[in-house]
Amino acid sequence: MAQDGSGDFFTVQEAINAVPDFRKDVRTTILIRKGTYKEKLIIPESKINISLIGEDGAILTYDGFANKKNVFGENMGTSGSSSCYIYAPDFYAENITFENSSGPVGQAVACFVSADRVYFKNCRFLGFQDTLYTYSKQSRQYYEDCYIEGTVDFIFGWSTAVFNRCHIHSKRDGYVTAPSTDKGKKYGYVFYDCRLTAEPEATKVYLSRPWRPYAQAVFIRCELGKHILPIGWNNWGKKENEKTVFYAEYESRGEGANPKARAAFSQQLKNLQGYEITTVLAGEDGWNPVADGNKLITVKR
């Protein structure tokens, strides 16, 4: 698809809509030519097994934000502000920028991911507050070699999500993550070999604060810039959260790595038993995006 008419479709949504519902035996690959596509994109649950592959410079953008009015004069809300919604399982995206262009206006989501078994490779997620919403409690998501930027709680939600070799960039003081992991869930957010950087004006950043009491976030072998505060972790102003969250690090390095000064309710892991990427994402069906890439397809009976 291309904006200049050289493809089969002019918009990404037109291409998505053309995919047969529940096409279970094969993946559908959509090539997005270079360009900025301003549209509120929805990938519904029936459009399974889709791969979106972008040329360099393929940008999907919109300018919604929580306090913006919808057609009925109501506030969009955080969930309604997203530029892109992904509900279809076994979705794959590569080399695409997902952007919310509304600026520093409060909650403004770039990508809302509700589907299970979602894989992003070499993608960018641009925004300020609440950039990436890992929405569903049943969702597993894998981010590889991605760039994610924001200010406050810019990676947040209920899902189990792995971030492998990602670049996480803070634009202002705030919080990198705000997980809302369910009680009893084995994994929340796990970051492997990621690099955390910041704009010069961002000097007071926490790794996480718990949106819900049983939040989980683990940083493994990550390089932390000096913008990360020595205490590292925040309890969202609720002392009782310190008894229920699971916040941990393993072999953090860089100017922001300060294990001796970390919050007392956080942990320094002694080993990685149970924290292999394949274990974190396996679920009951053995999903392994590292080995299988985007070849897996949904089986619908």
Language model features: what each stretch is:
Residues 1-301:
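Sequence-level preference for short, compositionally simple segments enriched
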